[in-house]
Amino acid sequence: SDDGAVVSCGLTRDYGHLPASMVGPTFNLASTESLKRLIDSNETDLVIPMSIDWAKMPWANDLLSSSAKVFSPTGGSMLIERDRDFARELCNKYNVPFPKAYVARNRLHALEIIDRHPKAFVIKNPLCSPQSPVHTIICQTPGDTSAWLECVDYAEGVFLQEYLGPREAGHIAFVVGGEVHSLVTNQEYKRAQAGNMGIVAGAPMGGLVEADPDDKYGLAAAMLHPLKPWFKETGFTGPIQATGIYHNDCWHAIEYNIRLGITATPMILRMLEKPASTLMQI
């Protein structure tokens, strides 16, 4: 709206409606018969989803068949975040270093894996979603790993990724037409705002962000540029974050995130001189 766009909001949850209503008109998508009709009748030009879970909603096909552009990757290109094992295979294909990782179906399977490979593992959800029963649990010893595996929720299984240390950073870039355009480098405070004060078992507490269009730390060069053939093949369009651990003198990719939502979209848009017209051209 700061760039002159007329903004409205589609509500997908039963809470947090006040902030959206202060910006413009709101529409409850749960009671909307046809999202396509709503978009077309309001002459909406662009839809910016706030979560990758939009693609799993009952109105997703309505959105894609509407007259509006969607600022998000679509279809198979979303697997780079959605399916952690897919991301591992993609890195192997394009020679991007990736920690040893395994998918376990249940507790017994997970314990069998760490019996065969007695290392510290980071425990993650294999299918990434804000609603997943498991979020990142960093284990720094084999004992920590075993203890956590006794009490996590195995409804979707678990993704076990070898722990490579604390030297972690992320890099956000725009991908358009198979090309990678660097934006920022960021570092999350996963343990506490002022240093390492315990094991992580949940979302980060905050972070630092540095404008980095020249990729001064080499994160994009190591983890995003090698994937350009795949980005072009799938038509991946939108913001992506590659997060890596610096280990044995190189960056190892630990995950990729499609950067949609309140934590990243406002920052990205404010970095653009003309955000509304730029997004319409992508």
Predicted feature residues:
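ATP-binding N-terminal substructure of ATP-dependent carboxylate-amine bond-forming enzymes
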Residues: S1-T74, L108
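Short, charged, surface-exposed secondary-structure boundary motifs
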Residues: L18-S21, R37-L38, L79-D85, S132-P133, ...
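Short, high-confidence coil segments that cap the C-terminus of an alpha-helix
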Residues: E43-D45, P118, A155
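Short glycine-rich anion-binding loops that position phosphate/pyrophosphate groups of nucleotides
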Residues: I52-W54, P126-C128, R259
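A conserved helix-loop-beta module that forms one wall/lid of the active-site cleft
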Residues: S65-T136
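Internal nucleotide-binding/catalytic subdomain
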Residues: V134-G261
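ATP-dependent carboxylate-activation loops
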Residues: R259-S277
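Peripheral (often C-terminal) accessory segments that flank ATP-dependent C-N-forming ligase machineries
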Residues: M280-I282
